[in-house]
Structures are given as C-alpha cells and as structure tokens.
C-alpha cells in the first residue's frame, strides 16, 4: 500500500504528464509554422524575385513589414496579443484565453520575420493560460497556482529538451517553510517537465551545445579569468538594463502599436544590415553558424555582440512578443569568442561559458538557470566547479541592481488602451 503522501503525489501525475505533452506540442506546432514562414520570407520569396536574402533593402523591408504586421495584430486582436513581455517576468499570472490567438500570431510573425527575441515568454504565457483555463474546469479543487507551476515546468522541459532546468528553477521557488518535503512538491512539476522534454525529443532535439575545444584541468588562474569574463558580460548586460526602460518609455509615447512596432522593425532592419543575417532571429541556430565560421575576427565578434544586444533591447522596447533568454545566450557566445580571440591564453570554454553565465544572470536574475545555460552550451563537467565559483562574485555584482524589465505604469499601457 502506498503512503498517503505518495497517493497525494500521484494525484497530480496524470494531469502533469498531460500538461507536459501539451506544452511541448504547442511549442512544436508554433515553431514549425514559424519555420515554414521564415523559409518563405528569407529563402523562397527573395529567390523568386531575384533578390539576395542578405540584401540590405530586403532585410530592412522584411523587418519593417514584420513590425507593422505585429503592430496590427496587437492593435486589433482581442486582448491585444497579451501583456507586453518587457513588463513581465518569464513566469507570470495567467492571461485571458481570448488574448491567445493574437499572441500566437504575433509570436509566429516575430520569429519568422527575424526579430531578435526567442519564443520562451509567449509560449510560457500561452501554456499557463490554457492549463489554468482547462484545469479549472476539469479539476476545480486544484488551485490556479498548481496549474501555473505545472504548465511552466512542462514548458521549460519542452524548451530546453530536459527536465533538469525545471528541477533547478523550482527547487528554489517551491522551497518554502511548509513541512511538506521539497521533493514531494517537485514531483508533479518534474513529471510535467519530463513529459515536455520527452515529447520534444520525439520530434526534434534542441541543439544548444557548441563545438568548442575541450577544457582539461581547472587551475587557480582560470577562476580569476572566468570572474573577469563574467564581470565584462554583466557590465554589457547592465548597459542594456539601463537602456530598456528609457527606450520603452520613449517608443510608447507614440501610443500607436502599429507606428511603434513599424519603427522598431525598421531599426532592427538597420541593425540586421550592419550585423548581417547571423545577427537576426532568436539566436540559437545563428550561434552555431557563428562558431563554425572561422573567418570571424575579434572585431567581428564584438560587432555581433553589440548588434545583438542592441537588437534585443529595441525588440523588447518596441513591444514585440518574445523572450530575452535565447538572444542573450547568443550575446554571451559572441562576447566569449571575442575575449578568447583577444586573449588566446584563456580557453574558449572558459570565456564562452562564463560570458553566458554573466549575461543570462543579468537577464533572468536566476542563478540556477544561468548555470544551466552555461553548462549546456559548453558541456564539460570540468567546468562545473569553476562556474559555481564564478557565480559567487557575479551574484555579488548584481545584488540590488535593477532587472531587465520595465516597471508597468499604474494605468493601462498604450497598447492595451487602443
């Protein structure tokens, strides 16, 4: 016979698995549609018209039209495509289901059009809203927070292809003063995360790891080097943190999402022309291309890091629907490769992983997620002790500093007033 605690854990296991599978399937369908549209916009259409896909006019034109299209969706769709991601954390309160169609369309347009944001925030919003709405009908005794936790865990598992990230994140958020053991509370979220990760793995494998030279043995000087690299990445990230709310306020003075996002798309197009096609889109596939291109120099990596960080700030400030984690990882990789090219004595494994740790820590202010992203992009167990040590001064630097998020005004924002 099972203990009552075990029966309590099993009670939510079936809904957890269902939510994990559904979270993954929603992500897969959205990404597939965006991929088809991206291929049409950036491969087939310019080929048919006899225009090079890296033509400045094409890049600026597509991104400007993408901004206008997303602005029209936000302007006229019910619920105005959900909340502005610049004002929201990764895991937020559930939104009304009526806002989801507009949010899905805005997300797909942004992903396909080359906007420098990832899918993580909108997908999280969609899955949480659906889980809460459906779960409240089927099992009204279960509170909204439980559905929110299960949906966010399933989405994290689906996004990263492993339940490890969910385990790390929720080990701190669920660790309250309750007498219920932590792993009892983690059971259902981990079931959801595992189901989401396994479902994603059936269709495609998220490819985060980079082909970077193996790091052999940790030395004391490597800790100092890693801390300096993380500090440089944090400094770059804090510039973006300072710029985001100011640019957001300036852009939203126009009070018209079509105009705001059209201008935002135009600026992104100019940045894309300067940085080239590798600086477009969410950044995961592009960072693989960046590492594979042996022709890039120190100045090229620096330019890509600056352009991508600027594009991230512009896209977020303009109100595009997307997340900031994936493009931040690209910035970390570019910074790390630049620092390795500048000081070849410091292994690329250290510069890249510590730069990712620093920049993701600025964006998320989540130590576990930052460690996870650094470890999966540069998968080397020898680096784990070094990353844990480097995390300590990095966390000290960011203690009490503002987050990369805009404080929502007391009144409704312009996009929701329209």
Swiss-Prot record:
<feature type="transmembrane region" description="Helical">
    <location>
        <begin position="99"/>
        <end position="119"/>
    </location>
</feature>
<keyword id="KW-1133">Transmembrane helix</keyword>
<feature type="transmembrane region" description="Helical">
    <location>
        <begin position="223"/>
        <end position="243"/>
    </location>
</feature>
<keyword id="KW-0406">Ion transport</keyword>
<keyword id="KW-1003">Cell membrane</keyword>
<feature type="transmembrane region" description="Helical">
    <location>
        <begin position="322"/>
        <end position="342"/>
    </location>
</feature>
<feature type="transmembrane region" description="Helical">
    <location>
        <begin position="54"/>
        <end position="74"/>
    </location>
</feature>
<dbReference type="InterPro" id="IPR001807">
    <property type="entry name" value="ClC"/>
</dbReference>
<protein>
    <recommendedName>
        <fullName>Putative ion-transport protein YfeO</fullName>
    </recommendedName>
</protein>
<feature type="transmembrane region" description="Helical">
    <location>
        <begin position="300"/>
        <end position="320"/>
    </location>
</feature>
<feature type="transmembrane region" description="Helical">
    <location>
        <begin position="149"/>
        <end position="169"/>
    </location>
</feature>
<dbReference type="GO" id="GO:0005886">
    <property type="term" value="C:plasma membrane"/>
</dbReference>
<keyword id="KW-0813">Transport</keyword>
<keyword id="KW-0472">Membrane</keyword>
<feature type="transmembrane region" description="Helical">
    <location>
        <begin position="371"/>
        <end position="391"/>
    </location>
</feature>
<keyword id="KW-0812">Transmembrane</keyword>
<feature type="transmembrane region" description="Helical">
    <location>
        <begin position="186"/>
        <end position="206"/>
    </location>
</feature>
<feature type="transmembrane region" description="Helical">
    <location>
        <begin position="343"/>
        <end position="363"/>
    </location>
</feature>
<dbReference type="GO" id="GO:0005216">
    <property type="term" value="F:monoatomic ion channel activity"/>
</dbReference>
<dbReference type="InterPro" id="IPR014743">
    <property type="entry name" value="Cl-channel_core"/>
</dbReference>
<dbReference type="GO" id="GO:0015108">
    <property type="term" value="F:chloride transmembrane transporter activity"/>
</dbReference>
<dbReference type="Pfam" id="PF00654">
    <property type="entry name" value="Voltage_CLC"/>
</dbReference>
<keyword id="KW-0407">Ion channel</keyword>
<dbReference type="InterPro" id="IPR022969">
    <property type="entry name" value="Chloride_channel_YfeO"/>
</dbReference>
<feature type="transmembrane region" description="Helical">
    <location>
        <begin position="10"/>
        <end position="30"/>
    </location>
</feature>
<dbReference type="InterPro" id="IPR050368">
    <property type="entry name" value="ClC-type_chloride_channel"/>
</dbReference>
<feature type="transmembrane region" description="Helical">
    <location>
        <begin position="258"/>
        <end position="278"/>
    </location>
</feature>
<comment type="similarity">
    <text>Belongs to the chloride channel (TC 2.A.49) family.</text>
</comment>
<feature type="transmembrane region" description="Helical">
    <location>
        <begin position="120"/>
        <end position="140"/>
    </location>
</feature>
């Amino acid at each position: 016979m099972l203990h009552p605690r075990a029966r309590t854990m099993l009670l939510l296991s079936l809904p957890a698995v269902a939510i994990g599978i559904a979270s993954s399937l929603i992500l897969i369908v959205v990404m597939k549609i965006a991929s088809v549209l991206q291929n049409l916009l950036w491969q087939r259409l310019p080929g048919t018209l006899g225009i090079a896909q890296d033509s400045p006019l094409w890049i600026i034109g597509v991104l400007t039209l993408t901004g206008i299209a997303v602005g029209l969706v936000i302007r006229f769709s019910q619920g105005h495509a959900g909340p502005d991601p610049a004002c929201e954390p990764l895991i937020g309160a559930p939104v009304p289901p009526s806002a989801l169609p507009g949010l899905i369309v805005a997300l797909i347009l942004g992903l396909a059009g080359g906007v420098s944001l990832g899918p993580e925030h909108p997908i999280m919003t969609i899955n949480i809203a659906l889980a809460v709405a459906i779960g409240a009908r089927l099992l009204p005794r279960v509170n909204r927070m439980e559905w929110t936790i299960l949906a966010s865990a399933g989405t994290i598992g689906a996004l990263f292809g492993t339940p490890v990230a969910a385990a790390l994140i929720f080990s701190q958020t669920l660790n309250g003063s309750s007498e219920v053991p932590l792993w009892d509370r983690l059971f259902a979220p981990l079931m959801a995360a595992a189901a989401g990760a396994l479902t994603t793995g059936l269709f495609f494998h998220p490819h985060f790891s980079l082909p970077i030279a193996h790091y052999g043995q940790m030395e004391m000087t490597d800790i100092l080097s890693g801390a300096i690299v993380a500090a440089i990445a944090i400094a770059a990230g804090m510039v973006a943190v300072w710029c985001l709310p100011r640019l957001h306020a300036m852009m939203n003075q126009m009070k018209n999402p079509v105009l705001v996002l059209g201008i935002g798309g135009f600026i992104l197009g100019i940045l894309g022309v300067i940085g080239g096609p590798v600086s477009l889109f969410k950044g995961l596939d592009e960072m693989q291309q960046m590492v594979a291109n042996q022709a890039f120099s120190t100045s090229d990596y620096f330019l890509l890091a600056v352009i991508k960080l600027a594009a991230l700030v512009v896209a977020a400030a303009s109100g595009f629907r997307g997340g900031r984690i994936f493009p931040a990882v690209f910035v970390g990789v570019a910074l790390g490769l630049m620092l390795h090219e500048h000081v070849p004595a410091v292994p690329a494994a250290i510069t890249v992983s510590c730069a990712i740790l620093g920049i993701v820590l600025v964006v998320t202010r989540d130590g576990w997620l930052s460690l996870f992203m650094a470890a999966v992009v540069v998968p080397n167990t020898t680096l784990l002790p070094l990353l844990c040590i480097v995390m300590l001064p990095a966390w000290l630097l960011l203690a009490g500093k503002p987050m990369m998020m805009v404080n929502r005004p007391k009144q409704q924002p312009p996009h929701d007033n329209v």
